[in-house]
Each structure stands twice: as structure tokens, then as C-alpha cells.
């Protein structure tokens, strides 16, 4: 009996020792080590430097992964408009994510509902301006010689149009939607991990709401949720914590509008023209594109109809205007079966699984418009529109982020423009605002602001792809048009994108080429 009790006591002692970070028989728990110092990671006895397990970027809601690569950007069809604004040029686009579909009415109304709940004018009349600024312009449906009042009244709100693309949204409104979506997705990630409670959502009012940056800086502290028993978040002292940092891999990068190069690359979907694309680690694909495409779809990429045998043979592959007065065809045999817009998941997806990259509605992209951007821009990740900013410091003597920085009326951390004086000694850029770099500034041959004799300005934004009201010519991804960033149209919507962090070919894949290590012979 005494021997039995002794065995039980010894077992308890071993368990207690293991709970204190020791292994069996009191040996130190194994830790990952630094390759440069040899010190343990995640060891409170060696400084407590925390390094999370290597995590791959999760695919955000609604997104599709697009592996990067090289392609010829620009005109793929005859330039019948004579714009000479999309000269073909070889470009490389880094991997990224993009929405499978255009943002629909139901998605945008979710955004409007959140604004109405958090920025309730009953609490502060000034909040009405925030709601008004986000409302789409439904009057874009009006035309002097057409009866479109039903669309003005019902298109945004009626449930029959829930999954139809939102229109009447300016570039600025689309940009703000991306900011809001980023914060809601990251807030949802915290709730899913038990690091924030759902109960705290209803208490958010005014500037006291979750934004990713304000959370990281400590301006906003959510009500903690119920974490699992195996929480991996620890402080330097080894105790559990609920405050997440970017290094933990839980928060995702921002949603944003795709660049023009990203959008065009994604629209072409050339992976479907690769005869043997790489499917898994260690299996190298062909570096080959069999056919150059005019349109996004892989079936009959130079025509408008499906050529495959079956009930779908002859069906239109996009929602567009076939000719004067022909938006849908003849009753009983409609060709694209959509007079105006259609469901965001209608028509055949392209090689990346993306819907309506041609037709339905044109889409805003991030770039500022210039006719010759393709000649001026970098040949990797090209983009015109950089205006560098930094967080606004209101108290430079404070080490506390909540007093060193400030928030605006919507709870977002305030930013200020980087000045030319701050940039002049840098090697990679010398100005804070480089929107008109080499095309409209004093160093270039073109000056788009001089004398106000042009419609092109630093507020002109590119939109891509054809719409329900366009002829087939505009459905080619290489075509490009522009509007001012505060304007909108019944034919222009948008979709969001997100930058890819880590491996170029996606999760469970390594970056670069790898060879097996060989043992040296003695």
C-alpha cells in the first residue's frame, strides 16, 4: 500500500514539473533556436523572444489565389479606337489574391448597414455625412431618352438584385469599402480564435470601433472571448495573452483595389493555356503558353460563343451588347439572357476561376490614368498612383502609441503625406507624391495640369473590362478607360484584391528551387 502511494506521489511530481515547462525527469523543454545567436525562441529563461510557428497566409473570404508570373500586358486586338494608350509590353506580376466575383449589392448593403449601426446620427448628427458619403449614386441609371426609373428606385435595395453587381460607386467609395472590409475580416479572425467576444460588437459606437491599425496600436481593446485550452499566444514571461501582433500571423493584409496589371493578368487567366501547370511541390510545370488570348475565357478565347459540343454550344460567354438595339437577343432564344446586369456568378469563369472579368460591369482598378503608363512604369509590379504617407505624430515626446498618434472621427489612425524634404536624400524616390512621375511633372515632356486643357488629371482613375452596355471590343482585358475618382456610372463596379505574403506558388509550396542536401564523404 505504501509503495503504491509512493508511486502516485512520484507521478504527480513529474506532471507538475512538466507543467512548469520541464520535460520528463525535469529535463528542459525543447525550444527552437536562433541560427544567428543560438538562443532559444519562446523561452522565458532566455529573454522570452516570441516567434510564432511558421504560418501560411490564409485565403480571405471571397478571394481566389492568383500565382504570379510574366505576361504581355496591353493591346491584344486591333486598336479600333485609335487611343494608342495600351502598347504591349512584357511585365511580371507578383502573386496576389482577387475576388472571385464582383462586389454585389448585398455585400455593399452590409457595409451601409454597419455604418448606420456604428455611426448612428441619433447619437451625433455629424455622422449623417459619413453615411451619405458611402451611398451609391442610384441616379446613374437615368438617361434622357430611356425609362430607367425602376432601376433608380429598386436596383440597389430589392432582394431580386441581391447578387447583382453594385454600380453607381465612385473610385473613392470603392477604396473606402476595401478599408472597411479589411477591418471586419480581421475582427472576425479574432472572434474565431476566441481573442475577441461577439458581445462587444454591439457596443461599438463612433470612433470607438475596431480597425486593424488602431487595434495594433492599442487605441481599441475588444472584450476578450473564450480561448481554447491550447492557446499558443504567450507573453515574454510565458503567460497567456489576448493582444495579437502582426507577427502572430492571425491578422491578414489589407483588402484593396487591384492594380491595373494585376487585374489584366487575372482576367487573361493564362494558366489555362499552360499544357501542364505545376500542381504540387517538386512537380515542375511547363514554361509555355499555347495560345494568346483576346478574351478571358479559355474556351474559344478569340470568340464570343462557347464552341464545345453539348447543350451549351453557341451560348454567349459574357454579358455584353451584341449590336445596336441588341442587348439580349430574341424572346425564347435570348443570347446572353441579361438586358442589364446579371448575377455575379453567371457566365463561364476564366482559367483562375474568376467570374465576369469581361462583361456585366466594368471594374475600377487602383491606377491613376496616363496614356503612356505602360512605357514608363517598372516591369515588375507596375503601378501609377503612389502618394507616400506616414502615421501622423501628435506628441513626439510620448512613447505610448495612444498619445503619440491620433485617430479620426471614424476610428482610423490618422496619416499625413510624406514631404519632399523628407524624401530628397533617398536613393529610391525623392518626392512624397509621385503620381505624375515622368508624366506630367517638370521632368517630363507632358504636363497634364498646365492650362487645364486636358481631361486627364491626377484624379483620373482607370477602369477595365467591358460592361453590359459595351460592344465586344471592350471585353478584351487590354482595353482601358478612365473616369475621375469621384464619378460613377451604371456600367462600372469593382472587386477587391489582397497582396500575397510568402510563397509565390501558394500554400504548402516553397519559394525558389530546392535540392536535397548530400552528405560529404569523409
Tell where the protein language model's regions lie, with residue ranges:
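Positively charged n-region of N-terminal signal peptides that target proteins for export
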Residues: 1-5
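Bacterial N-terminal signal peptides
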Residues: 9-14
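Functional-site microenvironments in short loops/helix caps that host divalent-cation chemistry
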Residues: 23, 28-43, 66, 72, ...
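Basic K/R-rich, polyanion-interacting modules in nucleoproteins and related proteins
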Residues: 43-54
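Short, P/G- and charge-enriched loop/turn segments at secondary-structure junctions
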Residues: 51-53, 83-86, 480-485
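A short glycine-rich, aromatic-capped structural motif
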Residues: 55-151, 162-185, 359, 493, ...
Amino acid at each position: 500500500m505504501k509503495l503504491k502511494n509512493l508511486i502516485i506521489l512520484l507521478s504527480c511530481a513529474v506532471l507538475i514539473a512538466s507543467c512548469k515547462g520541464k520535460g520528463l525527469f525535469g529535463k528542459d523543454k525543447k525550444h527552437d533556436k536562433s541560427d544567428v545567436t543560438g538562443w532559444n525562441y519562446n523561452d522565458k529563461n532566455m529573454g522570452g523572444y516570441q516567434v510564432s510557428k511558421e504560418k501560411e497566409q490564409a485565403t480571405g473570404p471571397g478571394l481566389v489565389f492568383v500565382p504570379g508570373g510574366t505576361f504581355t500586358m496591353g493591346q491584344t486586338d486591333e486598336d479600333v479606337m485609335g487611343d494608342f494608350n495600351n502598347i504591349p509590353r512584357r511585365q511580371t506580376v507578383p502573386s496576389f489574391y482577387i475576388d472571385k466575383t464582383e462586389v454585389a449589392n448585398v455585400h455593399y448593403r452590409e457595409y451601409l448597414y454597419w455604418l448606420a449601426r456604428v455611426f448612428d446620427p441619433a447619437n451625433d448628427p455629424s455622422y449623417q455625412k459619413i453615411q451619405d458619403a458611402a451611398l451609391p449614386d442610384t441616379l446613374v441609371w437615368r438617361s434622357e431618352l430611356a425609362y430607367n426609373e425602376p432601376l433608380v428606385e429598386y436596383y440597389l435595395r430589392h432582394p431580386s438584385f441581391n447578387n447583382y453587381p453594385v454600380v453607381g460607386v465612385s473610385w473613392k467609395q470603392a477604396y473606402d469599402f476595401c478599408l472597411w472590409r479589411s477591418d471586419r475580416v480581421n475582427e472576425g479572425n479574432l472572434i474565431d480564435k476566441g481573442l475577441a467576444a461577439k458581445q462587444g460588437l454591439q457596443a461599438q459606437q463612433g470612433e470607438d470601433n475596431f480597425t486593424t491599425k488602431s487595434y495594433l496600436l492599442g487605441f481599441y481593446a475588444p472584450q476578450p472571448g473564450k480561448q481554447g485550452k491550447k492557446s499558443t499566444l504567450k507573453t515574454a514571461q510565458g503567460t497567456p495573452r489576448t493582444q495579437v501582433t502582426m507577427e502572430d500571423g492571425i491578422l491578414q493584409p489589407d483588402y484593396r483595389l487591384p492594380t491595373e496589371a494585376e487585374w489584366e493578368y487575372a482576367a487573361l487567366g493564362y494558366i489555362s493555356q499552360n499544357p501542364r501547370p505545376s500542381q504540387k511541390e517538386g512537380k515542375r510545370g511547363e514554361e509555355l503558353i499555347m495560345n494568346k488570348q483576346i478574351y478571358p475565357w479559355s474556351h474559344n478565347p478569340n470568340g464570343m460563343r462557347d464552341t464545345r459540343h453539348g447543350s451549351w454550344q453557341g451560348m454567349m460567354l459574357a454579358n455584353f451588347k451584341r449590336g445596336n438595339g441588341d442587348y439580349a437577343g430574341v424572346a425564347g432564344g435570348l443570347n446572353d439572357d441579361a438586358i442589364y446586369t446579371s448575377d455575379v456568378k453567371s457566365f463561364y469563369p476564366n482559367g483562375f476561376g474568376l467570374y465576369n472579368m469581361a462583361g456585366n460591369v466594368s471594374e475600377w482598378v487602383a491606377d491613376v490614368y496616363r496614356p503612356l503608363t505602360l512605357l514608363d512604369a517598372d516591369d515588375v509590379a507596375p503601378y501609377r498612383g503612389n502618394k507616400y504617407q506616414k502615421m501622423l505624430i501628435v506628441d513626439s515626446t510620448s512613447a505610448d502609441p495612444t498619445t503619440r498618434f491620433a485617430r479620426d472621427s471614424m476610428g482610423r489612425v490618422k496619416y499625413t503625406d510624406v514631404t519632399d524634404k523628407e524624401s530628397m536624400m533617398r536613393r529610391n524616390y525623392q518626392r512624397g507624391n509621385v503620381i505624375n512621375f515622368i508624366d506630367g511633372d517638370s521632368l517630363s515632356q507632358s504636363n497634364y495640369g498646365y492650362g487645364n486643357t486636358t481631361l486627364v488629371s491626377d484624379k483620373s482613375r482607370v477602369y477595365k473590362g467591358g460592361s453590359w452596355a459595351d460592344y465586344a471590343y471592350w471585353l478584351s482585358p487590354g482595353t482601358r478607360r478612365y473616369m475621375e475618382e469621384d464619378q460613377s456610372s451604371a456600367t462600372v463596379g469593382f472587386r477587391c484584391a489582397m497582396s500575397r505574403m510568402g510563397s509565390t506558388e501558394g500554400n504548402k509550396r516553397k519559394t525558389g528551387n530546392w535540392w536535397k542536401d548530400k552528405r560529404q564523404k569523409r
